[in-house]
Each structure stands twice: as C-alpha cells, then as structure tokens.
Amino acid sequence: MLDATLKSQLKTYLERVTQPIEIVASLDDGAKSRELHDLLVEIASLSNLITFSADGTDARRPSFSLNRPGADISLRFAGIPMGHEFTSLVLALLQVGGHPSKASAEVIEQIQALEGEFNFETYFSLSCQNCPDVVQALNLMAVLNPNVRHVAIDGALFQDEVESRKIMAVPSIYLNGEVFGQGRMGLEEILGKIDTNAGARQAEKINAKEAFDVLVVGGGPAGAAAAIYAARKGIRTGVAAERFGGQVLDTLAIENFISVQETEGPKLATALEEHVKQYDVDIMNLQRGEALIPAAEGGLHEVRLAGGASLKAKTVILATGARWREMNVPGEQEYRGRGVAYCPHCDGPLFKGKRVAVIGGGNSGVEAAIDLAGIVAQVTLIEFDSQLRADAVLQRKLRSLPNVNVITSALTTEVLGNGEKVTGLRYKDRSTDEQHEVALEGIFVQIGLLPNTDWLKGTVELSPRGEIIVDAKGQTSIPGVFAAGDVTTVPYKQIVIAVGEGAKASLAAFDHLIRTSAPA
C-alpha cells in the first residue's frame, strides 16, 4: 500500500524507535482486512523492533493494537489509518517505541498524574483535517498513562456504530460510552476537560505574570506574525490564543501562500506555532478574551480572559480572526452536529449515499458542492442571490455534475428534523414568496465568516459589520491598541494579507512604545 517514497520516509522515521513494538491485528475475510494485513506486514518489515501478528480477538474488524512488551498501553486503530491519519499512525509507532513526545514536561506530568478510568473512542474520517489532533492527543495519553485507553475508529468502515450513535460530524469523541466532545480538540483542551482543577491552576499562573510590552490576542497568521516581529525587537511579548492557528486549522488546501506551492491548514498552523516558539514569546493557549479595559493615561491596558485570569500590557494587538457565519434560523443550533455541518471535507464522508444541501453560492459553497457530489447521492445548492457568485470555472464544473441541483433567489428559513437528526430544510423563493421544503439528511453551511469582536463592543470602534476599524498602521480608536487580520476592516480576507497586517501592526506597536516612553 505504501509507494517507494513513503516507505523510505517511514523507514527513516522508524530508525528513531528504541523499544520493541507489538502490532496485533483483529481481521476477518473482507477486502479491508486484507488491505490492513498487507499494510501492517509492510510496516513491520521496515524495523527489526516491530513484530506483527494477526491473532487479535477484538470485536472491531479490521483493527489493530500497538503495545510495548511489559507495558500496559491500550491504543487501537479500527480501520486503515491512511489519508490524514497516516501521520497519527506514524506518531503512535514512534511513541509506543520509546521516542519522546514534543509535549512539554508540564503537560506530560499532568497526563501521568491522571487517576480514574478513561476509555476514549474517537470517530474520524480519512479526509478530516481536524481529526488527527484529537487522535494524536488521545494516543499520547494512552501511551503515557495506563488509565487512559483509546480506540480511533474510521466511521466510514464502521457505519453500524455511526448509525447507532447518530454520529453526523467528525471527530466525535466518546468517554466511557458517553459523548465527550465534537470537533477539533488539542491535548491541552482535552486535559482541561478531564482535569477539573487545570483551569484554576492556569488562571493563577496567568494572573502572576508581569505586564507585557506587546500582548497579542489571537494565534492565527496575523497573531503569529505580530508576535515574531515584536519578539525580534527584544521586547516582552505574549500571545493569548483560544487555539493557535485560528481559522487556518479549518482550511484544507492552501495554494496561494507565496513561496509555499501547496500545503494544508493544520500543517501551516503547526509551522506558524513552531516559528513563534523559536523566539522568546510567552504562548498562552486555550485563552479567550472576554473584555478589554483600555489604559488610563500612563497606565496599562488590561485583557480579561474567559477563564477568570487577566493580563496587562503597554500595547495590545487584537488578532482574534473570524468564525463560520451561521444561518440563524430555527433548527440550526438544535441539529448542529446532527446533520448541520460547516466542514464538507471533515463530515462529507459520513453522508455517503445521502442527500445534502450546501448553503451559499460563493467559491466556498460551490467548491463544497463539487467535493460532496463525488460522495453523496444528491446535492442541492441554495443561494440567496439571483445568481451564483463563485468563479466561472467553478460554476462550469458544478453545472457539469449530474447529481447537483442549483436553487437561486432562495432564503433558507428553517432546518427540519425529527428530534434526533436533520430531515430537510425549508426555504422561501424570494421572487414569489412561496415556501418550499427539500427532503435531505445533511446541510453544509458555507456563507462566509463573522469577526470575533463580540467581546470588544463598547471599547474599540467597530464597523457596521462588526469589524475593528483600523488606520493604515493597524491603529484602532484606542491609543496603544492595534488590530490585524480577518477581524479588521482591511479588505480581502487572505492568509498572506493577514501575515503582512500582523507584521505591520507589530511594527506600529513598537513605534508607539518608543514614542510614548521617550523622555520629554
């Protein structure tokens, strides 16, 4: 299953293994079991420290466990972890084989101190770019603590479980048989949910921090660039981010970041964070801004965080980005994750052979419809305007597909369901005011982004669309408070533009520090 290049790369990685690894597969007579068998035999042939057997008795077939002789590690993949999950498999092999994790010593200690029984199950799809973060975090926890058990399950191969648990979005995480969470989660976020004292400990540590020269709020491309440019000036720099990478984490293919011909959002997000870590920057993850208290004359700005802590700084750069725009119609929140979705790449495979709608006729919506058409039975694209707004080449491709129906001049008015999952949607024909219903099982919302500025209302000046109004240097209406990226009024929401704006705001903040601290 592995081509020569991939096999060579994997062999090189496996040279880092220092302890023996046992791969035990549970297989049946199906084609997927044969595929998995061949893959595991191939992997075992690449290292003398790896042994393989097909003597497993697990009920999920095909599946396999990874263990270290004499250790109590419960780590299993149910399915064939290729696609986005191949990296998860490689990391699991390395970690079971004794190669140290990149997690901080503090996080490792926190994992090892967990008491109780934690039986995790994660449902993923091979095309989901959000799933590996969850799978890799829980795999590491299973390697480090015998109280943690983890099974990563390919929902496409175990449809009976997906149906019985009514899973309609990935990643979906279960703990001890109960729903634990849905969507991307990093290691620290998972630990924060099961280690109930973690939040209070973190807030105490944050409150004890000295004031920053530059505090960046947000960890997307704009925030990362701002932090690097500030740190390179040798000034005290901090980043408070809900999740490092921001909206980039939810982006699949990126082909317009200059000098990088092609990459994926999660890879770029990791690269951004690693670049920031090369400098003396205090990164505070899982921190969401709740209030901005502007400085009194000669004083410090204060950013209050949702976890109860607060930070002070001489200058602040707001780079909180944007989030998916919602339809705000009845039924949307009720059926979110139960048929209403926002990531076609992640959740599309769960709707194989079913009927879905895509809301939005811009590039994102049309691209989503094209992608989904290869998986689902029928796609209905619904656009509010009288015509699609996507690029002509995308529209031509869309209209060439036999299982796509386009409805324009349509206002979605309600998501319909049976109490458990989506069964359809209702829309109004804007030209006749007639109401129509479409029977379907999934709705993918692709209608743009909203700036994350709710917490800033009443402080910095906002545009009618809720964006932070900035001047040519990124200065907001509050002296010493700057903003950059998708959260601002700067047009064209692009990664490369956000990076430039972050750098510019940081340079402007440094200039402000020089001018306000200079002797009279």
Swiss-Prot record:
NAD: is it a keyword of this entry?
A: yes
In which residues is NAD(+) bound? Answer: 355-369
Q: Which GO BP terms sit in this record?
A: response to reactive oxygen species
- Required co-factors: FAD
- EC class (word): oxidoreductase
For this UniProt entry, which residues form the secretion signal?
none
Record text on cofactor binding: Binds 1 FAD per subunit.
Q: Which GO terms describe its molecular function?
A: flavin adenine dinucleotide binding; NAD binding; NADH-dependent peroxiredoxin activity; oxidoreductase activity, acting on a sulfur group of donors, NAD(P) as acceptor
E.C. number(s) listed in UniProt:
1.8.1.-
Q: Which residues bind FAD?
A: 213-228, 476-486
Keyword DNA damage assigned to the entry: answer is: no
Tell me the keywords, alphabetical order: Disulfide bond, FAD, Flavoprotein, NAD, NADP, Oxidoreductase, Redox-active center
The record lists its disulfide bonds as C343-C346
Against InterPro entries, the record matches this protein to:
AhpF_NTD_C, AhpF_NTD_N, Alkyl_hydroperoxide_Rdtase_suF, FAD/NAD-bd_sf, FAD/NAD-binding_dom, Ferredoxin-NADP_redctase_2, Pyr_nucl-diS_OxRdtase_2_AS, Thioredoxin-like_fold
What family does the entry list?
A: Belongs to the class-II pyridine nucleotide-disulfide oxidoreductase family.
Function, please?
Serves to protect the cell against DNA damage by alkyl hydroperoxides. It can use either NADH or NADPH as electron donor for direct reduction of redox dyes or of alkyl hydroperoxides when combined with the AhpC protein.
Q: Indicate the quaternary assembly.
A: Homodimer.
Q: Tell me the NCBIfam families matching this sequence.
A: AhpF
Q: Any extra remark in the record? A: The active site is a redox-active disulfide bond.
Q: What is this protein called?
A: Alkyl hydroperoxide reductase subunit F
Q: Whose protein is this, by species? A: Pseudomonas putida (strain ATCC 47054 / DSM 6125 / CFBP 8728 / NCIMB 11950 / KT2440)
What gene is behind this protein? ahpF
